[in-house]
Amino acid sequence: MATEGTGVSGLAARYATALFELADENKALDQTAQDLALLKQLMAESADLRRVVRSPLLSRSDQARAMDAVLAQVDVSGLVRQFVGLVARNRRLFALSGMIDGFLAELARRRGEQTARVVAARPLSQEQLDALTDALRRALGSKVSVDLRVDPSLIGGMVVKVGSRMIDSSVRTKLTKLKLAMKGVG
């Protein structure tokens, strides 16, 4: 599995590759992708879940039980539950987010899709998101999925990353450049 441009570590990439191949063999790629996206969302929203994932103080079995309880509540597939259990027993939960990113990146690559990571100063309307997706699709010549995050510290505008390319049209960056230019004048 190529990890170039995905920011996925070697450890996470190996686990992601193993899960991808297993899901492919079981013809469960779509279900596994949905389950992993849900897990990623849960980890982003729950500080308690992030503590379980990152805590070196919890035993392997405690981490595995906690993760299994969470996954059972949201009704994810047995494949993902077994995978997360294995990751917990191997003390690798700290890399779970990278494993999820690696799996989803490989699935997108196999489907001829690219993921644009967009950070905007404020939430985009559905119309704005559709226009951005369409513009990126035309510029890149392939299907594009947009991973949108909001960061008010940008002040205005957005930062778009696709693979190793980045377009930064944020007000924060423009102000920083102006500040540096003004320092050079005086």
From Swiss-Prot:
GO MF terms, alphabetically ordered: proton-transporting ATP synthase activity, rotational mechanism
Family: Belongs to the ATPase delta chain family.
Topology relative to the membrane: Peripheral membrane protein
Keywords: ATP synthesis, Cell inner membrane, Cell membrane, CF(1), Hydrogen ion transport, Ion transport, Membrane, Transport
Species this chain originates from: Rhodospirillum centenum (strain ATCC 51521 / SW)
Protein's name according to its UniProt entry: ATP synthase subunit delta
Presence of the UniProt keyword Cell inner membrane in the record: yes
Function as written in the Swiss-Prot or TrEMBL entry: F(1)F(0) ATP synthase produces ATP from ADP in the presence of a proton or sodium gradient. F-type ATPases consist of two structural domains, F(1) containing the extramembraneous catalytic core and F(0) containing the membrane proton channel, linked together by a central stalk and a peripheral stalk. During catalysis, ATP synthesis in the catalytic domain of F(1) is coupled via a rotary mechanism of the central stalk subunits to proton translocation. This protein is part of the stalk that links CF(0) to CF(1). It either transmits conformational changes from CF(0) to CF(1) or is implicated in proton conduction.
